[in-house]
Curated annotation (Swiss-Prot):
Stated role: Hydrolyzes ribosome-free peptidyl-tRNAs (with 1 or more amino acids incorporated), which drop off the ribosome during protein synthesis, or as a result of ribosome stalling.
GO terms, biological process: protein quality control for misfolded or incompletely synthesized proteins; rescue of stalled ribosome
Protein name: Peptidyl-tRNA hydrolase
Entry's EC annotation: 3.1.1.29
GO cellular component terms listed in the entry, alphabetical order: cytoplasm
Keyword RNA-binding set for record: yes
NCBIfam families according to UniProt: pth
GO terms for MF: peptidyl-tRNA hydrolase activity; tRNA binding
Residue positions binding tRNA: 17, 71, 73, 119
Discriminates between blocked and unblocked aminoacyl-tRNA (site feature) positions: 12
Length: 184
């Protein structure tokens, strides 16, 4: 029997983070949920993993869609517990995250590889004990001037960026659908 896909969006819980660059993974998950069957799927608290989860389908493929409720830098244990609980093969985990190295709106998916300094990915790799999972980087651009990356990712998107977020999140969801409906 084929393992389901586990689609994880990275972000931080709390109203102060809702519209920040660091939460673009959560935003992409919200778009993805509108495409599931039954539509839209609803996230509920999975108590064993402290994660918001929906067991649903994209097309005919069973998927587990999740938003960890831990701060991004310590999401690894939640992702590991989810993968173990739902018996998900590591290479069928897809993590959506904010990528400083990509221009705003660019999308790049890759199987395996490094964490590129992203503490959420670092935590997941450490908890899973492997780099063999799919990373979906969603470009948020570089900080202006000498602004520290840590400050930049916790700032809200500009008005122009906010107007483009629906398209960016739709593009990320399109890529997830391609991955889950074809074998990489």
């Amino acid at each position: 029997m084929t393992s389901p896909y586990l689609i994880v969006g990275l972000g931080n819980l709390g109203p102060e983070y809702t519209k920040t660059r660091h939460n673009i993974g959560y935003m992409a998950i919200d778009e993805l949920l509108t495409r599931t069957s039954p539509m839209p799927a609803t996230l509920t608290v999975h108590k064993k993993t402290n994660t918001l989860v929906a067991e649903t389908r994209l097309g005919t493929q069973k998927v587990i869609v999740a938003k960890p409720r831990a701060f991004m830098n310590v999401t690894g244990p939640s992702v590991r517990k989810l993968a173990d609980f739902f018996t998900v093969d590591r290479n069928r985990i897809v993590v959506l995250y904010d990528d400083l190295d990509l221009e705003f709106g660019a999308i790049k998916f890759r199987h395996g590889g490094g964490d590129h300094g992203h503490n959420g990915l670092k935590s997941i790799t450490q908890a899973l004990g492997t780099k063999d999972y799919i990373r979906g980087g969603i470009g948020i651009g570089r900080p202006p001037g000498r602004m520290a990356p840590k400050s930049f990712v916790l700032k809200p998107f500009s008005k122009i960026e906010q107007s483009e977020l629906p398209i960016v999140c739709a593009d990320a969801a399109d890529e997830v659908e391609k991955i889950t409906t074809s074998e990489l």
